Amino acid sequence: MKSALKKSVVSTSISLILASGMAAFAAHAADDVKLKATKTNVAFSDFTPTEYSTKGKPNIIVLTMDDLGYGQLPFDKGSFDPKTMENREVVDTYKIGIDKAIEAAQKSTPTLLSLMDEGVRFTNGYVAHGVSGPSRAAIMTGRAPARFGVYSNTDAQDGIPLTETFLPELFQNHGYYTAAVGKWHLSKISNVPVPEDKQTRDYHDNFTTFSAEEWQPQNRGFDYFMGFHAAGTAYYNSPSLFKNRERVPAKGYISDQLTDEAIGVVDRAKTLDQPFMLYLAYNAPHLPNDNPAPDQYQKQFNTGSQTADNYYASVYSVDQGVKRILEQLKKNGQYDNTIILFTSDNGAVIDGPLPLNGAQKGYKSQTYPGGTHTPMFMWWKGKLQPGNYDKLISAMDFYPTALDAADISIPKDLKLDGVSLLPWLQDKKQGEPHKNLTWITSYSHWFDEENIPFWDNYHKFVRHQSDDYPHNPNTEDLSQFSYTVRNNDYSLVYTVENNQLGLYKLTDLQQKDNLAAANPQVVKEMQGVVREFIDSSQPPLSEVNQEKFNNIKKALSEAK
């Protein structure tokens, strides 16, 4: 079919369309809000930030990258097993040798590797979901997204429920300067078409996307916001960048613009004499990477594939941006009192070069380790013993860990799934932070090997080599649910699609040796964990996921 993304250019200027569209959307947004903005999850006392002493409080940076796989940072030798990875399928435009891929991946992250080596590597760290919106919601709330009915990006399309207390709200109420820079993807949004890009048809270029008022970052605890509201944006000439509530022009390469904004945040905090909490969410290396990065990044790579070079250069642009931020922290005297919590929002997609998710099975949007086991570390110079931490942890732990580091009490009515990691990292507490972690989500082939034909044709469309937008049979909405529960020994996986149950040792990265039949008691106990998780969670917010959710419940009921 002819491109569904082609747009008719109206005679009225885009700015007027955007203004009227935003006004109309805002006027009707209140009618669509299912959950009132009143906080029912936590009771705040009547105080002002000035009642709290912020002297000596640490600065907090929650730093995320978009679709960066576990294999992109050398956390352990198993994740870089060349024999396993050399046989992995990739989209044609990214095909290079495995040795070149590993070399380029390591070359793209010198600053991040240095921070990782100086901090604590979470070698068994997982995000709470395999796709962006729910995963980011878990970071912002410290809760599994299922607790508030979010099981996929579709459930998140109406915004994360306003009853949830976002992390910056607590920091803001305790005297911190709070800022969000980069990707938001936690709002109810609306779109306004813009003229088609003449060079590429990156789907992020097709619309200006903007958030409904209630879900604006400034209404969820941030003093300042600069970035984009939806799932992604173009690397150049983005039509969807906002500074607070006003649309602003793109300035060059998006990673550089976000880095400049982050430096502005740390400078303002210095001027205000306040500690800061910065949520810095880069969009790299999210697809598509058809446009080269600026030469200072691009010239570092020569893999034999232009698109692969673009990918690694986008990662390197973030790495060098972090380097600039660290230099500014040193200049301002903030460096020694700053914490960095780093993760990718989910695993890598098949539409990228190796090493992607390393030797692990699965990709973004799946509960296999390749979808949720991400590069993750915490850096706090002089306050943490460098090294690996190998117990099960979650990005949901960032929320209580950051508050604990700032000596901010968690309100008693706030029911978190995350726990502070400081007792284990600083006080050498025995045991593990989590006995189990549970995921329920769409089991989508959107980003795995099964969908390579779509991605090959998608690149042809993006580059104007074809006017036909390819059919995608593997979207989230067309996919059944699956569940996974992990403890510190096993991973139990069930997929409705093929009615398959598998039990695997965590060391079985490819999940080839199914131990379910030989360990019925382990299976029974882990299924009980999933039942308890469902009983304490909410049903999906979207209608499209209701039947899928019920199928999971039915399968668990029949397994008793």
Swiss-Prot record:
Cellular component GO terms, alphabetically? outer membrane-bounded periplasmic space
Q: How is it modified after translation?
A: The conversion to 3-oxoalanine (also known as C-formylglycine, FGly), of a serine or cysteine residue in prokaryotes and of a cysteine residue in eukaryotes, is critical for catalytic activity.
Signal sequence extent: 1-29
The family line of this record is:
Belongs to the sulfatase family.
Q: Which of this chain's residues are annotated to bind Ca(2+)? A: 66-67, 132, 345-346
Give a yes or no for keyword Signal in this entry.
yes
Q: Where is the active site?
A: 132, 185
Q: Which UniProt keywords apply?
A: Calcium, Hydrolase, Metal-binding, Signal
* Cofactor info, note text: Binds 1 Ca(2+) ion per subunit.
**Obligatory cofactor(s):** Ca(2+)
Q: Name one GO molecular function term.
A: metal ion binding
Under the heading InterPro entries, the entry gives: Alkaline_phosphatase_core_sf, Sulfatase, Sulfatase_CS, Sulfatase_N
Positions of modified residues (3-oxoalanine (Ser)): 132
Q: What is this protein called?
A: Uncharacterized sulfatase YdeN
Return the EC number.
3.1.6.-
Which organism is this protein's natural source?
Escherichia coli (strain K12)
Q: Which gene encodes it?
A: ydeN
